[in-house]
């Protein structure tokens, strides 16, 4: 008996063998791919965690609360006490630039009942760290996620390496909130631009976030307007009532909160924007000082190097992937392009450049680097992380076609090296002295002047010159009076109230430039005002000094305050250096009808009629200016000078 195998059986056996080998090969090739996918995800998550941890440690090592941060807390104290969002009781002045920041700090202060300084420190650090997370999530989506590539931190390293970025990650100011909002907007805009199907609820959430821009900070309105313009002009998703109704709904959702607050602000405060904008006259131009401010950040850290390196890396990566940013010139094509990642990148880069030009135009600021941090963050967003795509065969399979990966690797190494250099660089070495540029390292300045490594609590600032003397002089004079700083650090000039003294005293008024440390070390019943006008409308509406220090280029003479506070206006009770004639002229100047209208807009009880009057006249109030010299103000207003010049 013989055994034989038919030809058909042989063919079937060969097919089964081939199929088995193919499946085995697929399984073997899938294992490295799965391992690489796991590695890629782990690399990205690890990069996010490492960035956040490094930033948190760096910021915590430089933790502090700035004097301007304490200004915010004075408003929060008044909110918690039921006095409203004001700096001084019975005077409606919006002394904080960021409305959202004020109410965010107030909410967590009310929720936790913790000490205000610790609340604002924790909230500021938290939103600063969240900004890094949102930035990296958005950029990861921009570059296609972790599939088949490694996403390595790049632009975020540049940001956190800068000492000013770590300084203002705490500080009590809104810097962290601004970049957190920008980072979240970036992430959601990228998601919107890449979505296969845009859902209406998520779209409305996006436009609501963008609409909050003017409440985050007035300059952020530019970013919000550009983002909303893109969304409004881009093709609409399917909506039951049609695209026109959806666009109307978008306008409503984006505008409901800022428009409602704007109406309330104009009626309540009598101004269309925060009083700080009036005090700093943000409409004025100081291009030369602005260029100094820009170089004060770019120069010492050689910041242009990582910006140039990452720009090259980003462009090379985009070109290697065949990305195009130039739409076809037709209305339909442009509208379609508006909902694309390249359009979102164009928007954030354009916003960063425009805001940089604006910061230069207004002269920058007196705080080293602070007013350029948002712009830098915007410019770094598209390269917050950069992708490294390895060849299928691993490192040994590199060919000339993989030149873009080599460029990115070189950029990462260069950025890492620069970050180590910048992180340990001290840009301003003048300590407690203010240079001719007027720019200071604010944290170092207060650390040295208070003798505290981490000035956080209000009482930490009692060791700042004049502060402890102020507290002692208020306690020693229960009848009240006007406190004016003297050249000495150990006492203040006190102008007493006129007789008879009312029961409980006439109240104290402190007139000093540093509003935060003064106001947080005295009761809310003590009126604290400043010659710059951040919390004092009369000073805010004075003319800007042509060659004054940036951010401090208004200074109202104390003669006006003697009159305004109702204190004794003759010697020997007034400080010796004050002129009785000037005080009398200031009294006459303050009788100007326009000035009186301005003052009562914030001091009259808030009735419905007062609200309507303020709402109608808010724009004219914002434009109104006085001359700080009483004699010249009398002439400007057309009043009769009590001390006319003799005829020549």
PLM features: residue spans?
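Intrinsic-disorder-linked linear interaction elements in eukaryotic regulatory proteins
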Residues: 1-3
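Membrane-proximal envelope and lipid/glycan-remodeling enzymes
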Residues: 5-648
């Amino acid at each position: 008996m013989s055994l034989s195998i038919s030809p058909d059986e042989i063919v079937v056996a060969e097919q089964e063998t081939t199929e088995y080998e193919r499946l085995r090969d697929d399984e073997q090739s899938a294992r490295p791919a799965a391992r690489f996918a796991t590695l890629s995800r782990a690399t990205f998550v690890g990069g996010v965690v490492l960035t956040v941890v490094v930033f948190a440690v760096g910021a915590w090592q430089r933790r502090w609360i700035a004097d301007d941060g304490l200004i915010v807390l004075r408003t929060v104290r008044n909110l918690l006490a039921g006095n409203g969002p004001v700096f001084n009781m019975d005077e409606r002045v919006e002394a904080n630039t960021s409305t959202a920041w004020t109410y965010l700090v107030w909410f967590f202060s009310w929720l936790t009942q913790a000490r205000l300084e610790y609340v604002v420190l924790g909230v500021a650090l938290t939103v600063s760290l969240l900004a890094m997370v949102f930035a990296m999530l958005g950029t990861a989506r921009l570059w296609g996620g972790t599939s088949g590539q490694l996403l390595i931190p790049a632009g975020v390293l540049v940001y956190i390496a800068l000492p000013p970025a770590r300084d203002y990650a705490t500080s009590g100011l809104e810097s962290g909130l601004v970049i957190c909002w920008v980072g979240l907007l970036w992430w959601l805009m990228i998601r919107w631009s890449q979505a296969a199907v845009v859902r209406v609820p998520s779209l409305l959430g996006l436009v609501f976030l963008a609409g909050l821009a003017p409440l985050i900070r007035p300059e952020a309105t530019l970013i919000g307007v550009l983002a909303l313009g893109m969304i409004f002009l881009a093709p609409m998703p399917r909506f039951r009532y049609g695209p026109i109704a959806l666009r109307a709904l978008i306008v409503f959702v984006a505008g409901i909160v800022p428009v409602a607050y704007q109406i309330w602000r104009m009626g309540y405060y009598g101004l269309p924007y925060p009083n700080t904008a009036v005090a700093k006259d943000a409409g004025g131009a100081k291009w030369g000082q602005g260029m100094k401010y820009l170089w004060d950040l770019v120069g010492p850290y050689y910041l242009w190097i990582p910006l140039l390196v990452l720009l090259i890396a980003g462009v090379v990566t985009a070109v290697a992937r065949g990305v195009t940013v130039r739409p076809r010139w037709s209305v339909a094509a442009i509208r379609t392009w508006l909902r694309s990642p390249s359009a979102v990148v164009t928007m954030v880069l354009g916003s960063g450049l425009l805001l940089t030009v604006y910061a230069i135009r207004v002269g920058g600021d007196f705080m080293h680097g602070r007013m350029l941090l948002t712009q830098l963050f915007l410019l770094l967003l598209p390269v917050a992380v950069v992708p490294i795509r390895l060849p299928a065969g691993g490192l040994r399979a590199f060919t000339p076609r993989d030149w873009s990966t080599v460029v990115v690797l070189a950029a990462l190494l260069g950025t890492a090296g620069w970050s180590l250099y910048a992180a340990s660089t001290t840009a301003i070495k003048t300590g407690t002295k203010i240079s001719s540029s007027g720019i200071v390292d604010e944290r170092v300045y207060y650390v040295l002047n208070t003798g505290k490594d981490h000035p956080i609590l209000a009482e930490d600032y009692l060791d700042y010159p004049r502060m402890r003397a102020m507290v002692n002089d208020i306690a020693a004079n229960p009848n009240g009076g006007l406190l004016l700083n003297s050249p000495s650090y150990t006492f203040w000039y006190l102008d007493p109230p006129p007789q008879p003294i009312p029961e409980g005293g006439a109240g104290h008024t402190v007139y000093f430039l540093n509003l935060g440390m003064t106001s947080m070390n005295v009761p809310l019943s003590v009126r604290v005002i400043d010659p710059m006008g951040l919390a004092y409308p009369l000073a805010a509406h004075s003319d800007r000094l042509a060659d004054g220090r940036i951010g401090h280029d208004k200074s109202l003479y104390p003669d006006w305050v003697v009159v305004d506070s109702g204190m004794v206006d003759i010697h020997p009770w007034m400080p010796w250096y004050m002129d009785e004639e000037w005080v009398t002229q200031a009294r006459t100047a303050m009788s100007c009808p326009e000035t009186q209208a301005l003052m009562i807009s914030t001091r009259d009880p808030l009735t419905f009629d007062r609200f309507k009057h303020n709402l109608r006249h808010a724009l004219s109030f914002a434009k109104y200016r006085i001359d700080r010299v009483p004699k010249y103000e009398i002439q400007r207003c057309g009043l009769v000078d009590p001390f006319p010049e003799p005829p020549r």
